[in-house]
């Protein structure tokens, strides 16, 4: 499934080094066998997750844990006792086919290009995503900008295991269309 989470306006960018590290540490902490974050993309004001979960109840509990824990730690980082961080609850979209999975991967990995953080047609992967861990690119792995290390994903579902084998490789220079 594809999960999106947006922060309120006026707060520091999620791509600032100290905020990004805080967010990555929390995502690592919440990642387990029942709720696996297979891929992600951290943007300035929002976050995309591609997850595999045992069921919707696990997703609800884990995402509640992510949002609450991040808000507390983020507020502490900003020197605030409390304060709203998230614009709304998370948005979840189930991925139903290999073509849909390929399109979601392209969108998530290319989101920094869509928002102008990386030149649109550049053969550069976003280091604030797991794009550099993805094996089905149309050419040898291009250079990565910024970011942190993430454990190599071990997808369990056929959609993640075979989507690009069925639908074709992702094109490094491709950027998602604006919505």
Where are these regions (language model features)?
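Short Pro-Cys-Gly-centered "Cys-loop" motif that presents a nucleophilic cysteine in a tight turn
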Residues: 1, 5-45, 52-179
